[in-house]
């Protein structure tokens, strides 16, 4: 058993999964659960029976028209060309903000309609989170944004101005041996609470990499 108490993006849990461990991945940040739920639990794409398959669902989301929603109103400037960093928030270009809103709203609609289950929703949220991070006007931390597109040197301008585009997730790669295909479980709780829940059994590796 590999217990990852602060899983974050899940890179260490994925490596453990690939090496045959049963994985317990935890992080109290909801984004981590969204990233890791499907990627760790599945060895192939979920069925997406109601939507005609995973790739068709991704293609549909990429073709959606732009929508002004929460991200556009709260994380984008009023105008990409004329803005005031003391008043406007410059996390995303407006076009990408509207794409994020459109895609997230459609995923929520599918969930409300019962067209996707929790694992399938995770398989859609993960590429949205990754692609949104790629086009963000930040240096990787969302506590602040560059005061101007790309920062002082504008070295990241090409990335920030690129079109947000979803690519399918890659799921856990495990060996053919059934013993190499252990289950994985995801938690979204305080690390101490998880440790208390696990007090009745031992783990092979307890990985703690707190923020």
Report each predicted region and the residues it spans.
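Phosphate-binding glycine-rich loops and adjacent basic patches that engage nucleotide phosphates
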Residues: 1-2, 15-21, 58-67, 83-87, ...
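Conserved S-adenosyl-L-methionine
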Residues: 1-53
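SAM-dependent nucleic-acid methyltransferase catalytic core
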Residues: 11, 83-211
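Short, surface-exposed, charged/polar-biased interaction segments
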Residues: 23, 37, 44, 57, ...
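Conserved phosphoryl-transfer catalytic core
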Residues: 31, 36-99, 106
